[in-house]
Amino acid sequence: MGFWPKGYKSCFFLSFDYDASSAETWKTPDDLSSLSKGRYAPRVAVPRILDLLDRLEIKTTFFTPGWTCDNHRDSLIDIVSRGHEVAAHSYAHERMTELSAEKEAEVWERSIAALERVGVKPQGYRAPYWMFGERSINHMKRLGFKYSSNMMDEDIPYLLKHNGVDTGLVELPVEWLLDDWPHFEMDRMGPDEVYRLWKPEWEGLHELGRYFGLTCHPECIGRVSRLKMLERLVTEAKKGSDVWFPTGKELSDWASKKLK
């Protein structure tokens, strides 16, 4: 018996980290060009991505800093109104493990409050830069979160333990190979090159009946040639009727039921 709901062989979890200019507000606040790059997300990329998801008939998850909610409210309302999930991603893309305990607690409160202002009670959390520590686990438990998407030690969801103790959280694993940012923004690879990385990884995981967790950033993947590549990859994956495309919440709910 497979891991996935009846009729599905594998899972393709497409998600977006909707950072906009959140990190630049504290990293490079006087650099107008850097700030403008983040604005490409709400102005251009997110509308294109939402239209693409509509065409592909996929609902997915946007991990969103509170700053983005506060500064691009209409965009978040559009995401929610189209049936997508919004999950937590700090307040201003802070490096959480480098903060004091007091500052981290403040960031968590600001993040939750901002999400609530757009009508969202977040169920999942992804740490900026995947800098994820014990304090974050404790805050997630305190605040009633259901899942984490931060760990890199599996290619199928699992019940997250820390120091041998069950946290009560489902983990939706991640991997830098399956993140658009380092390939496009750091290594400056072309869409065809990235496709040649992602396609065999997807095919291999599908063959094994596993989980393919792809992390994209609107201001990065939303450029026309890159978005066409993503559409090609997802369209090819959808050709079979045995691939599940869930939101993070749907995936964590299923894994929790399956594993407990």
What is the predicted function of each stretch?
Residues M1-R82, E236:
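Active-site beta->alpha N-cap acidic-glycine motif
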Residues K6, R55-L56, Y147, L159, ...:
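C-terminal domain-boundary segment and adjacent tail
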Residues Y8-F12, L56-T60, S81-E85, G119-Q123, ...:
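Short, well-ordered coil/turn segments that N-cap beta-strands
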Residues D17, L53, V86-H89, Y125, ...:
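Conserved, mostly hydrophobic/aromatic
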Residues S33-Y40, K59, F63-G66, Y91-E102, ...:
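The substrate-binding groove and active-site-proximal loops of carbohydrate-active enzymes
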Residues V46-L50, R73-I77, A105-I112, I137, ...:
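Generic structural signal for well-ordered alpha-helices
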Residues N71, R95-V174, I221, S225-M229:
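Catalytic domains of cell-wall/extracellular-matrix polysaccharide-remodeling enzymes
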Residues G168-W202, H206-L208:
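A conserved mid-domain beta-alpha-beta active-site/ligand-binding segment of alpha/beta enzyme cores
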